[in-house]
Amino acid sequence: MKQIPIEYQVSPYMVFFLIITIQMGVGMLGFERISAKLVGNDAWISTLLFGISVNVMIWIIYQILNQGNGDIIAINQNVLGKWIGGLLNFIFLSYIVLLGATTLHTYIEVVHVWMFPSISSWVIAGAFLGLCYYIVTGGFRVVAGIGFFGIVIPSILIFTFFYPLQYADFRNLFPIAQHSFLEIMKGMKGNMFSFFGFEMLLLYYPFIKKARTSQKYAHYANLVTTIVYTYLMILTLAFFSEKQLANAIWAYLSMIKIIQFPFIERFEYIIVSVWAFFILPNVSFTLWGVSRGIKEALGIKQKYVLPVIILFIFILSFFLNNRNKINLLNTWTGQIGFVYIYVYLPVLWLIQTAKIKLRR
């Protein structure tokens, strides 16, 4: 593929912010209940192990990208041929569309439940997608800049991670490791959607200056995410009883309801509003990634592809009008992502490595 001009690239350290931004999305608000439902008070172990597995996958992704010296679109076709590679590119780009749609519509559900139950989904979707269109048309550097501020601005809420500690009962965590390893592995499923998004590296790798040197920042970013998610899981398990957590769909928001100020009665309104700074770069990244991927695969300019993708996600807002449908979308997205990332990418790496060795 063509070398990206340096004026369109970002510094290697920006990968740290790009990965954290897309990992700490809407899943962070309620991932605890799903894992706890599967493995109870050992859910924090599942979260920790899944975070470690993501670091392994980041290493594999960098092996693929460094050897292929391009993005996943070009690498798939170079390694597997035009048709098989093209099919796998279609699957990956479809998954990225679903990832963006799931993130946006799950956040819309949060807004409905916690703030504005009567507002139409299409109104919120239209406002977000309009902003995302403006951001994405500015190019990758603008998207990356929004991703940076998507970490900096919400960081003012970090104190909410510690306020509930005074009400935590850490005896809820015992006995530790009462579930089998297989059960804990199954519990990792509850963390998939929260951690996913790091695979966007497969698309924006060519836009990083001295991309090979950015790997350490990717690992650091996932380390931070893993620590945050594991801590939140431990805090949630200590704050809620098992029965209470089973009914807490948005566990994090339920916890911070206890925070009150003389001038703010419903502090969770602030949380949901500020969380938009996480969601905006999340959706923008996916829109940029899909439009860029289609440009590389089919030669269609991004400015023509982008409105079509946005229209598709907008139309979904008329159909994703209840919890069951959004849950189903979450499940499909997680399963497709798991198979592509944890099954296909290692196989691709092995085939690619074997081909390189045979050529030598």
From Swiss-Prot:
The keyword Transmembrane applies. Belongs to the amino acid-polyamine-organocation (APC) superfamily. Spore germination protein (SGP) (TC 2.A.3.9) family. NCBIfam families: 2A0309. The gene is gerQB. It is found in: Membrane. It is a multi-pass membrane protein. Coiled coil: none annotated. Its main location: membrane. The chain crosses the membrane at residues 11-31, 45-65, 84-104, 116-136, 142-162, 188-208, 220-240, 270-290, 300-320, 331-351. The keyword Zinc does not apply. Required for the germination response to inosine. Has no role in L-alanine germination. It comes from Bacillus cereus. GO terms for biological process: spore germination. InterPro entries: Spore_GerAB. Keywords: Germination, Membrane, Transmembrane, Transmembrane helix, Transport. GO terms for cellular component: membrane. This is Spore germination protein GerQB.
